[in-house]
Design a protein with these regions (language model features):
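Conserved helicase/translocase motor-coupling segment
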Residues: 1-37, 43-44
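A cross-kingdom feature that marks ATP-driven nucleic-acid transaction machinery
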Residues: 27-197
Length: 197
């Protein structure tokens, strides 16, 4: 899984392809370990924000160098949303943060009143000393529906750590009515202190 996110259909294709081959999960794990040891990729663990514990589910992998990734796949896929998420991950690591992927378990009633359990994802849980930030990477926020989708996991977190959306949209840095900071990717990359504003 050497990308920040894979589309659902791509995941199914990969799973089916691997099942048809004679490659074992242990072999895949070894290759991923080799890639990590050679500093091609880095893994981020999943962290249950409410339960305050790491989850033994698949990790997410990020490339150290997106140029190498793009060259290796012959520049066939350029998914800007995934690339931006990878850039944010790399910048956070460069600034010294430990970075995990957040999971927020929720129980919600559907239209019929039946309770369903879901896991909402927070792209990054960043820790440095006593500072913690929850960060969502949103390539664009074209409408209120997309903004609501990005804010939803934050609203289910019951602590006072800072919650931030980083977007490619050229918006001024601002807080919304829930205290969630929105900052554009350019300000984030150029101003190491922008998360503290």
């Amino acid at each position: 899984m050497p990308h920040s996110r894979l589309e659902q259909s791509s995941q199914l294709f990969v799973v089916r392809t691997v099942k048809k081959s004679k490659i074992t999960s242990n072999t895949i794990k070894k290759y991923l370990d080799y890639f990590e040891d050679s500093f091609l990729i880095e893994s981020a663990q999943r962290y249950d924000i409410k339960g305050k514990a790491y989850i033994e589910t698949p990790k997410k992998y990020y490339f150290f160098d997106l140029g190498l990734r793009n060259a290796r796949i012959n520049f066939r896929q350029f998914e800007q949303t995934h690339s931006m998420e990878n850039v944010i991950y790399n910048e956070l690591r460069m600034r010294g943060y430990s970075v995990d992927v957040g999971v927020v378990p929720v129980a919600e009633k559907d239209r019929n009143g039946k309770v369903t359990r879901k896991q909402l994802e927070v792209d990054f849980v960043c820790n440095l000393g006593s500072s913690r930030y929850y960060i969502q990477s949103a390539y664009t926020l074209p409408d209120e529906a997309k903004r609501t989708q990005e804010v939803r996991p934050f609203r289910k977190i019951d602590d006072s750590f800072r919650k931030i959306i980083i977007t490619r949209d050229m918006v001024p840095t601002h807080y919304d009515e829930y205290g969630i900071l929105t900052v554009n990717i350019y300000d984030f990359l150029l101003d190491p202190k922008c998360l503290e504003k």
